[in-house]
UniProtKB/Swiss-Prot annotation:
The gene is apt. Pathway: Purine metabolism; AMP biosynthesis via salvage pathway; AMP from adenine: step 1/1. It comes from Chlorobium phaeovibrioides (strain DSM 265 / 1930). This is Adenine phosphoribosyltransferase. One of its GO terms (cellular component) is cytoplasm. The lineage of its organism: Bacteria, Pseudomonadati, Chlorobiota, Chlorobiia, Chlorobiales. Catalyzes a salvage reaction resulting in the formation of AMP, that is energically less costly than de novo synthesis.
Length: 177
């Protein structure tokens, strides 16, 4: 069974008209989780994307990013919600459909010139990914690529990210579904 078929669809969540793609059914399954980590590992061992560290976005990006960093022998840096990091931070606000939110990274988490693979579970609007990329750049890092389990191209996040000059990779997508 492929990755896509292991992802649960929940209609009208978190609000009416939204088809929520729930990856918990994928990652709770040891075969499904292995498919994800092996698929990403293969991508970064074989496709010449040069990077030094994996950055994962809270919360599901931590699950993927830390496992991927381990398999590739890289370090892992968390991008967190406000107030969760104990040392000096840099913040980035971003737009949500219903307001704004913010993410943070430790000021010393990434050295200038460090090449970063940014990882999260799902790409929809691109707001969180672009905010995380802005954080990486504020502390002097360079985003080599952004990787996701799921891309929802109909929502437009992939186009926004590509238009900003970033590379995007996803293991699967739900287009027109």
């Amino acid at each position: 069974m492929p990755i896509k078929s292991r992802i649960r669809a929940i209609p009208d969540y978190p609000k009416k008209g939204i088809m929520f793609r729930d990856i918990t059914t994928l990652i709770k399954d040891p075969v499904g989780f292995r498919l994800v980590i092996d698929g990403l590992t293969q991508r970064y061992l074989e496709n010449g994307v040069d990077f030094d560290v994996v950055v994962g976005v809270e919360a599901r990006g931590f699950i993927l990013g830390s496992a991927l960093a381990y398999t590739l022998g890289k370090g892992f840096v968390p991008v967190r919600k406000p107030g969760k990091l104990p040392a000096d931070v840099v913040s980035q606000e971003y737009e949500l459909e219903y307001g704004t939110d913010k993410v943070e990274i430790h000021l010393d988490a990434i050295l200038p010139g460090t090449r970063v693979l940014l990882v999260d579970d799902l790409l929809a609007t691109g707001g969180t990914a672009l905010a995380a990329a802005a954080l990486v750049e504020k502390v002097g890092g360079v985003v080599a690529e952004m990787a996701f389990i799921v891309n929802l191209p109909d929502i437009g996040g992939e186009r926004k990210i590509l238009d900003k000059g970033y590379r995007v990779f996803s293991l699967t997508e739900f287009e027109g579904e």
